[in-house]
């Protein structure tokens, strides 16, 4: 049996995440009282004829604060029964959440006559702290549209075939900010930039012209060898510490050339020694 617990601040994309999981064969329950989590997991484990072997539940700020405070012990009770359980925590920056609520005109569950939307969003972070602290995977949805979020959920959760550590090698551009969920960040802006070659500017690091140019640069090859050597040494230590997800981010200026090229090569190299390695290019379509 596999259990995914979805949480996060209101407006961060929890409903979308549950919809994706439901579309992919999960039995989904929204707004589960946290205190019922161990009982639900146990019943699902014992009565597979009633529930699918894949279950996803949403636990968020609609719960009583006292139940949210108990989340660590409730989660441990589930895991003591040897259930394959992942905690997904979604979030976005305050400005984005405010904008999303303004656009949809939906009411935040914590707003009252004396508590503004901005205050409710801030208070929600504290309420959900016990869940956020134990999240196996945190996703920042600030810059993701609906379709990108759906694709990210599929990549990170549904492409994880078995218990163990899922590794993601992600390219990005510093001009759009660093990925907040990255565990390791490598800055490759010091390398020769194909952008300044007019014939390469409109190509990406996935295309032969850019790949050939970068492969011929000694500094690029040296950077690649150093990063792969470091990761081959230390990523198995992350896996040994029972981490479910590890994100390695490779950043250049725009996220189109150098970081894309290196992320592809590094991801391919890591697949020789690690089981579950995925590659994603955050800014390639922008």
Swiss-Prot record:
GTP binds at residues 60-63. Pfam families: PapZ_C, RapZ-like_N. It comes from the Bacteria. GO terms for molecular function: ATP binding; GTP binding; molecular adaptor activity. Keywords: ATP-binding, GTP-binding, Nucleotide-binding. ATP binds at residues 8-15. NCBIfam families: PRK05416.1. Displays ATPase and GTPase activities. Belongs to the RapZ-like family. This is Nucleotide-binding protein PA4465. It comes from Pseudomonas aeruginosa (strain ATCC 15692 / DSM 22644 / CIP 104116 / JCM 14847 / LMG 12228 / 1C / PRS 101 / PAO1).
């Amino acid at each position: 049996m596999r259990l995914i617990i979805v949480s996060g601040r209101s407006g961060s994309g929890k409903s979308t995440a549950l919809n994706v999981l439901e579309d992919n064969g999960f039995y989904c329950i929204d707004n589960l009282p946290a205190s019922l989590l161990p009982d639900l997991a146990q019943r699902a484990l014992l009565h597979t004829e009633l529930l699918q072997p894949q279950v996803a539940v949403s636990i968020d700020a609609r719960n009583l604060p006292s139940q949210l405070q108990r989340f660590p012990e409730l989660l441990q009770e589930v895991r003591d029964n040897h259930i394959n359980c992942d905690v997904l925590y979604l979030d976005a920056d305050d400005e984005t959440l405010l904008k999303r609520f303004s656009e949809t005109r939906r009411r935040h569950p914590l707003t009252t006559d004396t508590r503004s939307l901005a205050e409710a969003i801030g208070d929600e972070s504290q309420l959900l702290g016990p869940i956020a602290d134990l999240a196996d995977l945190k996703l920042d949805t600030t810059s993701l549209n609906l379709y990108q979020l759906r694709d990210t959920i599929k990549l990170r959760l549904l492409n994880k075939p078995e218990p163990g550590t899922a590794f993601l090698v992600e390219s990005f551009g510093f001009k759009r900010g660093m990925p907040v969920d990255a565990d390791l960040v490598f800055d490759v802006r010091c390398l020769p930039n194909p952008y300044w070659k007019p014939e390469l500017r409109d190509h990406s690091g996935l295309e032969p012209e850019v790949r050939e140019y970068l492969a011929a640069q000694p500094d690029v090859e040296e950077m690649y060898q150093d990063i792969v050597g470091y990761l081959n040494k230390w990523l198995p230590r992350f896996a040994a510490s029972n981490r479910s997800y590890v994100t390695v981010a490779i950043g250049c200026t725009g996220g189109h050339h150098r970081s894309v090229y290196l992320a592809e090569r590094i991801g391919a190299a890591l697949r020789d020694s690690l089981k579950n390695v995925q590659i994603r290019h955050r800014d390639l379509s922008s």
